[in-house]
């Protein structure tokens, strides 16, 4: 970045940060007050929460023309995205390459994280952004209510509930400087059949070209809900969602290619197809004003099939056509809330989850004249079944002091079945080729017991201000794939054996303040420290030419500390709105062979700033700035010791978005430019193997919405 451009953007950040001198009462896009969130599993006012929670209205994201949830969340305070070779995963509070198992993503309280952590990416693309009512972000923790995998935090995506008659259509178009047209077409509506029965739907289709040549996504979303008011005390919601897409990609670029022309085709040719159906049931019963009961049951399935997967390597081409993954989660949750005193409640419940993952890996190549063919087939069937009980009490002693505390117990059983078949034909000096055809089978079963608890005293020191302290002990359970190791030396011993892993245990200490000062701006600040023990580490090389081997084991300890700051101000009777945020993270390995090293893929600083100005009730503009500081890539890891080295810097970058919104009667028009200054940045970097993926350059959008 040229110095003058960087100075301009930093100056604009500074301007926005000090622009609260004459601000009026905040009614910001990112709200921490007077909104309804589900941090207890039951809807309540945000004022009743005892810790800092960010609630983002879906309409505020939809009004900025985003085409995906990932694109929208990337601009949100405290959230980053990490790609360590599998795809992009949401990261919070510096989880790095553990982000896919240490940040829990939910839809209406149902987890969508996949079970196969070694090859899994949380399926954000399957979420229809136009069907989002709001997004609740709970930084750091949540183990008592949500179980394993919340060290970084919880993101709960609440979908729309529309019962009254409505119908709307929307058309969205997107393009890059060099072309790459794409768009979305959708309809949504609702019909109230009678006073006790209603139905809503949202159908969106999309066909989007990527920034890089050879990238395309096309498919559709179907989201439906049926609402049944059984009587005055109970209601039932039945949901069905379906997502299907076909994605084409062309793989990585070298650094030289990325610098010369980041839009050019990569070194591979891949086509994947994704199918994801979901069924859910949500039942509420209100016994009286004191006791509320909630039953949730759901089933979700995701299949990823590699229709074409080719990569050029060492003067040959390897084919993985026919490979794929399947992830199925079935669950039930029984929750109760007792409001036993004024502003005091007790929540308790039981959860069951059966999570199954299947992996099919097919690799084929030939290298004439020596290798006629080499075909490797790996089949894995992994299951985790868990039973959990939990309780959380919040007691309001007086108008100044509230104490919250809770605990969770989780019992889990694991089963992993693995099959590996190796087929090879090699030419030698003998007249006939050598034929190898061997199959290795392995299975293992494990049981685990895990506990979590938290305590949070909250002090209301003024009419507008709250101060809280929180201690939480949580856990990140191993995944079934991590219970299987492979020997380095055979010598007649079985190639596979079970690993004796413990869950990762973390302790989080948090101090937060939320206030509304002098009647002109809101202030929110959080300080946290997280120490994680028994982190699961990895040794080996599954692709070694001398024989694949790997080992999962508990050894590492990490510590993460940080600061999260959010501000927002309004001017001119809410016509001019400013927003600012700053997140600072210091994430390091604090024990073991890599003691003192930074956790890869984690930026120390993320800053956001923005303004919105309404010229009148029908026309408004916005500008958003997002900054990520540099981070270390994965470097290389010694397969015998686990020592990291040669971790190169991933460059820092600014993103600048501008846009407008215009309303005319029932028509709404959105238009804007994302990455206005065409900043070049990497969404994936492997400097050792010279592999890079480039983020989207300057792109333009326009959208039309019409409500009948």
Predicted regions and their residues:
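Conserved C-terminal beta-signal and adjacent last beta-strands/turns
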Residues: 190, 325, 393, 469, ...
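Surface-exposed extracellular loop regions of Gram-negative outer-membrane beta-barrel proteins
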Residues: 246, 252-260, 356-370, 413-438, ...
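Short acidic/polar hinge/loop motifs at secondary-structure boundaries
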Residues: 110-139, 160
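Extracytoplasmic beta-strand/coil segments of soluble accessory domains associated
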Residues: 70-111
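Outer membrane beta-barrel strand-and-loop segments of large Gram-negative receptors
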Residues: 320-338, 378, 386-390, 496-502, ...
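Gram-negative outer-membrane beta-barrel transporters
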Residues: 341, 396-403, 411-412, 522-533, ...
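N-terminal periplasmic "start-of-domain" segments of outer-membrane beta-barrel proteins
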Residues: 32-64, 89, 223
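Transmembrane beta-barrel wall of Gram-negative outer-membrane proteins
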Residues: 168, 177-207, 211-250, 270-292, ...
